[in-house]
């Protein structure tokens, strides 16, 4: 039976955050009382055909993904003014804030815990033929049970086996193939995984430039110019260096990464 949603079925609470195309509000479904995050996208802000296509694609992809480390989309509806996305409520909120409150970085055990959860989600997404293309702390949430949740599928695409040329992502996380406007595939998420691991451990991204100078950042990316301090273990260093590889085909695959010593030391081998 198809569930039909309308806004009057929800009691709207406090503002949780603002995104590129709208706001996210805490909400309670009146009949059953369950708590959700309601993303409200004003239709007037969808000003191009490409934006409309991107939002439709985001809804299609996100609503079909069901994994403990991916924020659930329970449904969606619209009226004359807005599009509404009914999302899982992540009780501990924005992962970026959680990271900032911890001084901007984690120790190796905690880093490996959260990176493993990202990898489990990416493994599932690969099975579903999905590339996220914008993995970064700002697109992660944290559930009440400390489960990391990948959110914001605005740049996600189907057909991970096809090679694409759309330029997307965040400057500090851009893979070499994106910087050089080359075709790209699911290898882009492996690069982002390496950047994320580095940032969790170091409190900054590896290819940062002064005043966010794009040309300087791109030069560093293409030359793999970054440093790892000696205080970082050889396992962690090796894990990062095997993901931050210029050629996408030479990056460590997720199955190998899940069983890398950096992960196994703290969490055991994975059968995923």
Curated annotation (Swiss-Prot):
Its EC number is 2.7.11.1. Residues 10-263 form the Protein kinase domain. It catalyses: L-seryl-[protein] + ATP = O-phospho-L-seryl-[protein] + ADP + H(+); L-threonyl-[protein] + ATP = O-phospho-L-threonyl-[protein] + ADP + H(+). It holds the Pfam family Pkinase. One of its GO terms (cellular component) is nucleus. One of its GO terms (molecular function) is ATP binding. ATP binds at residues 16-24, 39. It is found in: Nucleus; Cytoplasm, Cytoskeleton, Spindle; Chromosome, Centromere, Kinetochore. InterPro entries: Aur-like, Kinase-like_dom_sf, Prot_kinase_dom, Protein_kinase_ATP_BS, Ser/Thr_kinase_AS. GO terms for biological process: chromosome segregation. The active site is at residue 134. SMART domains: S_TKc (SM00220). Belongs to the protein kinase superfamily. Ser/Thr protein kinase family. Aurora subfamily. PANTHER family: SERINE/THREONINE-PROTEIN KINASE IAL-RELATED. Component of the chromosomal passenger complex (CPC), a complex that acts as a key regulator of chromosome segregation and cytokinesis. Has a role in error-correction of aberrent kinetochore-microtubule attachments to ensure that sister kinetochores become bioriented and connect to opposite poles by promoting spindle assembly checkpoint signaling. This is Aurora kinase. It comes from Encephalitozoon cuniculi (strain GB-M1) (Microsporidian parasite). The gene is IPL1.
